[in-house]
């Protein structure tokens, strides 16, 4: 089972090395997308079979397997875009047919070509593929304040949709460089815009883009023709303010929008940071915040540990707008919000947590912990903050101890904190 995977650009007259030309002349079966066939069709042998690469890919792989069943020594020559090992079809072949022999003949990938057109060094560029993929890796790059981000798009994650998401969460200190039909001398277009300009623009497919923070542009003296700076879209006087500050280690409580302005309805910043430490989030992958209220714990976790998947639960519907407002204010995209009674929430489609914080339980702590245990990973932990005050009728620490005993959970020694004039707080933690 042998594949030759040949990378091509959008040029209607592709150039191939003599070795590749010989493979094409001798080839018997070819494969690729419709666009690839339109480009290379004139160079293929007459009446050569062509296997279209379309979804579902399982049908494509069945045709490949059928070919090798009858012609085991006859290779399939596959055409793919750019570098087939760069988020490309050669990767897919390796995963599906690990025993296959694969030879790759790459050309420049689309982001390399765009960087070349912009005369932009790209050794420091973070690559994110949104082609058939969700937002998390892109969000992570934004939160980490990456200076240069190369993005592979699709028809859902368009330049306009990407720009709108960035504006919504306050990451508007980037310029966007969009390349369309790269490699096609008749259709190729490279455009540099502000995010605000991009939101109302449509671009032809295929396209890709490179995002560069404004201060990065200044620092690199990037003043290529057609850039945001060259067109005067950015005032040079704004050089020192057109970028986010480093995300703080601890957001001031007063900066959050609160539930009905009630300052006691938020986990205070020092307690919040100690809570995140107790959750061991650097080693975790999925964090659940049950009873998020203002969203302060979820947002702090999102900013400090952007690799996490975060699911936030709250029974009060008015808190949905509050967490959304706070998430946008602090640049924390990607928190999965669930409104309703946690005990009635269907958890089957959610990622299994390995860290859970219970910020509110409404007197149903035992039931909540029992439900959490049905999905908590084997190495997971649960953390809760307990406060004992004259006006607080429910003894959360006692409920916690009883629940841990009934559910056979191993408790860590509690951490007792007294903050300013507030009542003592205990940070409680348990594991399976």
Language-model-detected regions and their locations in the chain:
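Conserved SAM-binding loop of SAM-dependent methyltransferases across substrates and taxa
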Residues: 294-306
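Conserved class I S-adenosyl-L-methionine
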Residues: 284-293
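Class I S-adenosyl-L-methionine
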Residues: 1-103, 112, 307-310, 314, ...
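S-adenosyl-L-methionine
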Residues: 313-353
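A short glycine-rich, Lys/Arg-flanked "PGG" loop and its adjoining helix->strand segment in the class I
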Residues: 369-381
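Conserved beta-strand signature within the Rossmann-like core of class I S-adenosyl-L-methionine
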Residues: 379-391
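A contiguous loop/helix-start segment that scaffolds small-molecule binding in enzyme catalytic cores
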Residues: 2-5, 18-21, 76, 146-221, ...
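Class I SAM-dependent methyltransferase SAM-binding "motif I" and its flanking Rossmann-like core
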Residues: 3, 81-146, 343, 400-418, ...
